[in-house]
Design a protein with these regions (language model features):
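Bacterial N-terminal signal peptides that target proteins for export
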Residues: 2-14
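Bacterial N-terminal signal peptides
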Residues: 12-23
Length: 383
């Protein structure tokens, strides 16, 4: 190839690359923008789910130019039950929901809630393959006109936070404890505590003023309340609480989108946001345990119960959660409570600790995300 031919080939390659860029930009410009309000009961960054919601906003606004995604954290627009009703009525586009909290509008959503069922990371990561989840997706679609894309992970180390250490059932007795939902109330009741449900955004002032003595929450929740509840106790993976996020959209809104809009949003949620959320949640658990773990239960920090201590909680709780769920749902739901327990046991057996790809996540590479987005500050209430 002579100099002239080489120059011509180079110019052709540059032109082709330019056309590719222009074509991609043109394709993006052809996509109709969307306006999405997404309601959540969790707090914003650095909470891992809050970071994931912020990533969702960034990706939608980048891939669908002209779009606007408005994030409503900590129940600032709707709490989860009201958000579901708003989606059913066509008054809200999307919700980052939670199964246990959704039970207030559909008791069936409780069938996947319960401690010491999914007790390995790999088992939790296989949740979307469960027949129970597919049943709930179908039910939400038919009964509430809500499309659930998939599930997300709460902290695998859900636990109990307080101003003093809660380890034995006796430590819980008489304590006013914030619960995440009615299913957890049954567990707390079995331990002798006085449970109350409230949105997470209301928790810090309630702790500070003594309205509650402690709370059930995630490690992300502990990180937000460690000044008010510095003693956080966990009983292994899902040892005290077992609940999960779901991400859904109003069919009333979703069905008005064209196929290209739906494909882009579905790809963002399924292929990018949900896998990212599970990884950053895993890494958040790891970094917080690494930073705040204490082996001395008399000192503040994250204390992981030994087998005997966790066993005492499990014995005291008994079948309280499953019994409560069965008592509050139609008889037809009982089979799904039992089905989920069987699916969970099979998933744990198939995914022992250390075997999942999730546990191989490079958390050093994920560290930057904890400072990527502006730290969330709860808006001050107007006087």
């Amino acid at each position: 190839m002579n100099l002239a031919q080489g120059k011509k080939a180079l110019l052709s390659a540059v032109a082709a690359a330019a056309l590719t860029v222009v074509g991609a930009a043109s394709a993006m410009a052809d996509v109709k923008p969307v306006t999405i309000r997404i309601a959540a009961d969790l707090t914003g960054p650095p909470h891992p789910a809050g970071i994931s919601m912020s990533l969702f906003k960034e990706l939608v606004e980048k891939k669908m130019p002209g779009s606007e995604v408005r994030l409503f954290f900590a129940g600032s627009l709707y709490r989860i039950p009201e958000a579901v009703e708003a989606m059913t009525d066509g008054n809200l586009e999307m919700t980052w929901g939670q199964f246990g909290k959704t039970a207030a509008v559909d008791p069936y959503m409780n069938v996947v809630v319960g401690a010491q069922l999914l007790t390995t990371p790999g088992a939790i990561d296989s949740l979307d393959s469960f027949e129970t989840i597919k049943f709930l997706q179908d039910r939400m679609n038919k009964v509430h006109d809500v499309h659930i894309f998939g599930s997300g992970h709460l902290s695998m180390y859900m636990g109990a936070g307080s101003g003093s250490r809660l380890i034995s059932p006796a430590d819980f007795k008489g304590k006013k404890m914030r619960s995440m939902g009615p299913a957890e109330n049954a567990l707390l009741g079995a331990l002798g505590a006085n449970p109350t449900t409230m949105a997470f955004g209301d928790v810090p002032p309630a702790l500070q003023t003594g309205v509650i003595d402690g709370l059930l929450t995630s490690l992300g929740g502990f990180n937000s309340t460690k000044d008010q509840a510095p003693f956080f106790t966990i009983a292994g993976i899902n040892g005290i609480v077992g609940d999960y996020y779901w991400i859904g959209a109003s069919n009333s809104w979703w069905n008005k989108l064209d196929t290209e809009q739906q494909a882009i949003l579905n790809g963002i949620i399924i292929n990018e946001v949900l896998p990212f959320q599970k990884k950053i949640n895993f890494c958040n658990d790891k970094r917080l345990v690494d930073k705040y773990e204490t082996k001395d239960p008399s000192k503040p920090g994250i204390y992981i119960m030994n087998a005997a201590e966790a066993g005492a909680i499990k014995t005291a709780a008994g079948t309280a959660t499953a019994d409560w769920i069965k008592s509050k749902t139609p008889d037809a739901a009982n089979m799904w409570v039992d089905k989920f327990a069987m699916e969970a046991a099979a998933a744990v057996a198939a995914n022992p600790v250390g075997s999942s790809d999730l546990e191989k996540t490079d958390c050093a590479a994920m560290a930057k995300w904890f400072t990527t987005y502006e730290r969330y500050k709860k808006p001050k209430k107007k006087k």
